Amino acid sequence: MTDLQAFREETKDWLETNCPPEMRKPGDVCWGGRNPQFSHPDQEIWLERMGDKGWTCPTWPAEYGGGGLSKDENKILQEEMSAIGARSPLGSFGIWMLGPALLEFATEEQKKEHLPGIVKGKYWWCQGYSEPGSGSDLASLSTKAVEDGDNYIINGQKIWTSYADRADKIFCLVRTGPQEPKHDGCLLYTSPSPRD
């Protein structure tokens, strides 16, 4: 038996034991957060089990809470989840947008601060990209961030901020330098949601 065959058998057994019946059919996906909205008690159990295993973000490094799986192992995980009808336990901008950017560009300290919480669904993230007059043209953003000691003072507007009414935290693009060239001088900034 190859390592991948052994992994498939272990994965199949783990899923059979740990995936609650209600999570083996189509339905809502939890977005996490401090006050998560579970449509069924099994949803909370599934999120906790998959988060503990790192399988909400299976290919992220284990040192940041992810599963540390190779592409081949992740393919097997997805195939075995599909075979029993298991749905993903967590969906969020943290997983889809912020996490990959942090893995690529963040400092070690920033990765350790944010990634484990994303894996476990600890926070519901919203994005602050679009601005009045610029829509999806992110290079034309005008919201400014001015460094003030260890902090930034942010001044500007964001619109169409999906899920801002439910989010615990926001990640947004802000300008830290002059607008020319307009693709330079931008920063991805994370912050507690303004509703805190």
Where are these regions (language model features)?
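N-terminal glycine-rich flavin-associated loop
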Residues: 90-109, 135
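A short, hydrophobic C-terminal helix/tail in secreted or cell-surface proteins
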Residues: 192-196
